[in-house]
Amino acid sequence: MKYLKLLLLLLTVSSYSQYKDGISVVQFSAEFVQENEISLKKFNDHNTHLFYLSKHSDHFTNEKIIYIPTVILFHDGEEILKIESGVTLNLPEDTTARIEKAIDKILS
């Protein structure tokens, strides 16, 4: 029983950190604002993740997500860029460009 608890803890920790590995573009959202999300297809050369509040509330808490949608760029576990929608529930128009610029800076 003790080993089972340890295994579950390790799996939880590893799945939590996996979405931050390498260069990762992570979008935090909810089903009712799907139309306000950005497409992550442009970033398919990197790790991309889309988390919904109804399914991954623990990630929202851990990353201190206040507004949805929010996009965070991670590099090897470190938060590089965080773009929030604010009370409008709309991400800024230059969100994709800002992410691309930050990725280019990481790669240079």
For the regions a language model picked out, list residue spans one by one:
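Structural micro-motif
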Residues: E63-H75
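Non-catalytic, surface beta->alpha helical segment in thiol-disulfide oxidoreductase systems
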Residues: L73-S108
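Hydrophobic h-region of N-terminal signal peptides that target proteins for export
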Residues: L8-S17
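Solvent-exposed loop/turn segments at secondary-structure junctions
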Residues: E31-Q34, D58, E79-I80, L89
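Sec-dependent signal peptide recognition
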Residues: M1-L9
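Short, charged, surface-exposed secondary-structure boundary motifs
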Residues: H59-N62, I83
